[in-house]
From Swiss-Prot:
Residues covered by the S4 RNA-binding domain: 94-157
GO cellular component, one term: small ribosomal subunit
The organism's place on the tree of life at top rank: Bacteria
GO biological process: ribosomal small subunit biogenesis; translation
Family: Belongs to the universal ribosomal protein uS4 family.
Species name: Rickettsia typhi (strain ATCC VR-144 / Wilmington)
Function of the molecule: One of the primary rRNA binding proteins, it binds directly to 16S rRNA where it nucleates assembly of the body of the 30S subunit.
Coiled coil: none
Assembly and interaction partners: Part of the 30S ribosomal subunit. Contacts protein S5. The interaction surface between S4 and S5 is involved in control of translational fidelity.
Molecular function, one GO term: rRNA binding
CDD domains: S4 (cd00165)
UniProt keyword list: Ribonucleoprotein, Ribosomal protein, RNA-binding, rRNA-binding
Name of the protein in its database record: Small ribosomal subunit protein uS4
Length: 205
């Protein structure tokens, strides 16, 4: 088990949810915080603590996006027309690494980011190696031929149709995906309750 895998499972226990819905997640059998006092249920969380935890869960879920990137995404969502929470999630879901993960090209958000940063993903026919690139409606994602037969990729692609959201499409025969539209919050398949309103309240203070 790699350090990233151990670390992400520990994050699930620390934040009190199975962040990625993984059956191997230690939170499923030890649903309390790690450490000596992890099973102490008498510890009360302040209002600020609840807001902070909601933010930390989302940051971890999207592959530990940096605080600067997260705050800048919120600032952009605030400037856009419409509901800030919906805008915020729409921006996070339009990131290239997130879309690669959602299309089941990679088994985890961390693996998706690695594929992008190593130049294994094409965006509209050109190499794209920046994970935070935001996609637009109609953008096309391709997997480079050099990695198409890697077992990990093949195993992930085999899940097509099971969990691919409706705002994306993926053609298994050509290994090509399409970003169809910006999703609504209700479209996003979070494995836990994403309390986006608490994140918005925290950043709006």
């Amino acid at each position: 088990m790699t350090k990233i895998v151990r670390s992400k499972y520990k994050a699930s226990r620390r934040l009190g949810v199975s962040l990625w819905g993984d059956s191997k997640d230690a939170f499923n059998t030890r649903n309390y915080r790690p450490g000596q006092h992890g099973q102490n249920t008498m510890i009360k969380t302040s209002d600020y603590g609840l807001h902070l935890k909601a933010k930390q869960r989302l940051k971890c879920y999207y592959g530990r996006v940096t605080e600067k990137q997260f705050r800048n995404t919120f600032a952009l969502a605030q400037r856009m027309q419409g509901n800030t929470g919906e805008n915020f999630i729409g921006l996070l879901e339009s990131r290239l690494d997130t879309v690669v993960y959602r299309m089941n090209i990679a088994p985890t958000i961390f693996a998706a980011r690695q594929l992008v940063s190593h130049g294994h993903i094409k965006l509209n026919g050109k190499k794209a190696d920046i994970a935070s690139i935001r996609l637009k409606e109609g953008d096309i994602i391709e997997i480079k031929e050099s990695i198409q037969q890697i077992p990990l990729i093949q195993e992930s692609i085999a899940k097509q149709g099971q969990t691919t959201p409706k705002y994306l499409s993926f053609d298994v025969s050509s290994l090509t995906g399409k970003y169809l539209r910006v999703p609504a919050l209700s479209d996003v398949p979070y494995p836990f309750e994403a309390e986006v309103h608490l994140v918005i309240e925290l950043y709006s203070r």
